[in-house]
């Protein structure tokens, strides 16, 4: 019975945690891959060089790589 209640509490905790990530990749033009030189931060519009990382004002940690931009929350919020 004790294990049952622990599993219920653990399941509730997992269900209320939220994590958010998003990213973007360069789109091909006329079927040709376009080499990525910079990434544009969607939060403030600033350009960032490839292989750079930065933190946004709204708690996202972003990284620009040759395959695109990826941003994730720096923490997990409880709903």
UniProtKB/Swiss-Prot annotation:
Residues 1-19 form the signal peptide. The keyword Zinc does not apply. Its main location: secreted. The keyword Disulfide bond applies. Gene3D superfamilies: Complement Module, domain 1. Disulfide bonds join 21-72, 39-64, 62-71. Pfam families: PSP94. Keywords: Disulfide bond, Secreted, Signal. It is found in: Secreted. InterPro entries: PSP94. Belongs to the beta-microseminoprotein family. Shows an slight inhibitory effect toward the metalloproteinase brevilysin H6, but does not inhibit the metalloproteinases thermolysin, HR1A and HR1B. This is Small serum protein 3. It comes from Protobothrops flavoviridis (Habu).
């Amino acid at each position: 019975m004790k294990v049952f209640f622990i599993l219920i509490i653990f399941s509730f905790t997992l269900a209320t945690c939220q994590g958010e990530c998003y990213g973007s990749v360069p789109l091909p033009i006329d079927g040709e891959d376009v080499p990525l030189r910079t990434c544009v931060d969607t939060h403030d519009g600033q350009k960032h060089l490839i292989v750079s990382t930065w933190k946004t004002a709204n708690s996202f940690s972003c990284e620009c790589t040759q395959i695109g931009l990826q941003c994730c929350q720096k923490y997990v919020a409880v709903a």
